[in-house]
């Protein structure tokens, strides 16, 4: 099963949407393998957003992501990265389709509810950045056969 990182951003925490967003992923059939609240440091933010370092909005993103703690989650499932990104919707909430998380809860390109890993390579790096090995749990999901055909997992 594929694993991916989701960060519930400060705007999600501030608006009291944590439960609703987690429920969306659970209802889809993803398995929550790890979850914790963390306050992102400047060092972690600089590492996480290093690909945006030269952009004029780099500091604004770091400032927004350190307003309050965030919730980091490890979700698991068949094609979990693609599934999570599809559920999340396009980055700009104003353009995201209704029915997606951003389409339903966001009007912003920055305050867009969640961060989601964009590839298996990125997911591996990001999960190691935010979780220790003993913070990711492997357990049997009792409804697995209700979610997938027996040859899909």
Curated annotation (Swiss-Prot):
Its cofactor is Mg(2+). Its EC number is 2.7.4.6. PROSITE patterns: NDPK (PS00469), NDPK_LIKE (PS51374). This is Nucleoside diphosphate kinase. The active site is at residue 115. One of its GO terms (molecular function) is metal ion binding. SMART domains: NDK (SM00562). ATP binds at residues 9, 57, 85, 91, 102, 112. Homotetramer. PANTHER family: NUCLEOSIDE DIPHOSPHATE KINASE. Pfam families: NDK. Disulfide bonds: none annotated. It comes from the Bacteria. Its main location: cytoplasm. It is found in: Cytoplasm. InterPro entries: NDK-like_dom (IPR034907), NDK-like_dom_sf (IPR036850), Nucleoside_diP_kinase (IPR001564), Nucleoside_diP_kinase_AS (IPR023005). It catalyses: a 2'-deoxyribonucleoside 5'-diphosphate + ATP = a 2'-deoxyribonucleoside 5'-triphosphate + ADP; a ribonucleoside 5'-diphosphate + ATP = a ribonucleoside 5'-triphosphate + ADP. GO terms for biological process: CTP biosynthetic process; GTP biosynthetic process; UTP biosynthetic process.
